[in-house]
Amino acid sequence: MTVEQNTPDQDTIVAQATASGRGGVGIVRVSGSLAAKVAEQIIGHVPLIRNAQYVPFKSNTGEPLDQGIALFFKAPHSFTGEDVLELQGHGGQVVLDMLIKATLHVPNVRLARPGEFSERAYLNDKLDLAQAEAIADLIDASSEQAARGALRSLQGEFSTQINSLVELLTHLRIYVEAAIDFPDEEIDFLSDGKVQNDLKAITKQLSSVKSQARQGSLLREGMRVVIAGRPNAGKSSLLNALAGRDAAIVTAIAGTTRDVLKEHIHIDGMPLHIIDTAGLRDSSDEVERIGIERAWQEIEQADRVLFMLDSTETHENDPYKIWPEFMRRLPKNMGLTVIRNKADLSGENVGKVQYDDYPVFQLSASHKQGIEVLAEHLKECMGFHSSNEGQFIARRRHIDAIERAEEHLLLGKQQLEDNLAGELLAEELRLAQAYLSEITGEFSSDDLLGKIFSSFCIGK
């Protein structure tokens, strides 16, 4: 799990830092020990550090290429921690390509790999891995909430919480391992309840961070919403209403939908993956049975399930009373919203009705009545109206690492309570700490780093 930290390549790298295509301004970024030499070739001198200079840009043969702003940042006071040169010219693609070509005439200057500028910033301790990922998340944000969350992660709010947990685990490990390594000191780590209390406090704090990370993941990646229910409840009509188009075939024949239908939509910029499934029932039809099994596979992977029912058939709102078999199979802690469809036929008022632990919505999918209220509810489920102003963006790998750390804390607690095994507790604490450290990159494999930074755009 742990590897030695790499050092940045000795090559100087160059790339276009702005998006490809036409624009008013285009930026070429150079990073490395030869940035000053590139400046001498392109503009004839090295600009004053952190001073914008309006100068002509020339090729290696002295031919004019463009004119614009040159900025020079001296290591380590730059984004990458290396010498950095930025050439800000006009945004025509041909002009920028010629400018990059001119920089490549300097020996040992090469084109940057995707994400290599951010990678060098990480390797030079200018930011940690979670902050580096937040750069890409900020660029790709599809809503204001996602952008704000990514900025908070970039500013280190997520990393601060992870580092706090790592520090707490470090102190607890020192205490436990001291009792193991120095038995003559007679440190009884069970007698005063310190270990148990610390474990409880750390687990509680980790659970809180996990909850925030899951919310942040929904902002970044979108929420998987599965529409489930019996045949002819109106699931496909609801998919069409949310998607704003006829994505699914709708008929009065029960069992029309036999396979999984997926639509990627945005509600006020918030990404959702809406999944329509086959009606759930016992069936002798082989094709329909396969569709039902696929429906359950989607349900088990969902972030939220819309439990669809025909309001003309029951006045009951409690899903356990309506369909106990469905609720018993539903994954524990699954977010569930009850949808009472066909309000136009049952005469029910359109809107939200709260029932115990499950929000209940009365609507008419075919007439698109009550859809806006449901859309607001889905936005709230993603944290659109979250009262937590400190919401940060997180990725699936972050959640996986937190969950693994949580598992090891629980295992350590069991070893302590069942076996009084201090050595095994210490090992579980070490593993929990290592998984959390993967988030910020303190312990990360080369494969993980390569995968993360390769997903960045070239100039980042």
Curated annotation (Swiss-Prot):
Q: Which residues are (6S)-5-formyl-5,6,7,8-tetrahydrofolate-binding?
A: 29, 86, 126, 460
Q: Which InterPro entries match?
A: G_TrmE, GTP-bd, GTP-bd_TrmE_N, GTPase_MnmE, MnmE_dom2, MnmE_helical, P-loop_NTPase, Small_GTP-bd
Q: Can you cite a GO biological process for this protein?
A: tRNA wobble uridine modification
Annotated protein name in UniProt = tRNA modification GTPase MnmE
Record's subunit section: Homodimer. Heterotetramer of two MnmE and two MnmG subunits.
- Main function: Exhibits a very high intrinsic GTPase hydrolysis rate. Involved in the addition of a carboxymethylaminomethyl (cmnm) group at the wobble position (U34) of certain tRNAs, forming tRNA-cmnm(5)s(2)U34.
Pfam families on file: MMR_HSR1, MnmE_helical, TrmE_N
* EC code(s) of this entry: 3.6.-.-
Residue sites binding Mg(2+) per the record: 236, 257
Q: Which CDD domains match?
A: trmE, TrmE_N
Specify which residues bind GTP according to the UniProt entry for this protein.
232-237, 251-257, 276-279, 341-344
UniProt keywords (A-Z) are: Cytoplasm, GTP-binding, Hydrolase, Magnesium, Metal-binding, Nucleotide-binding, Potassium, tRNA processing
Mention one GO molecular function.
GTP binding
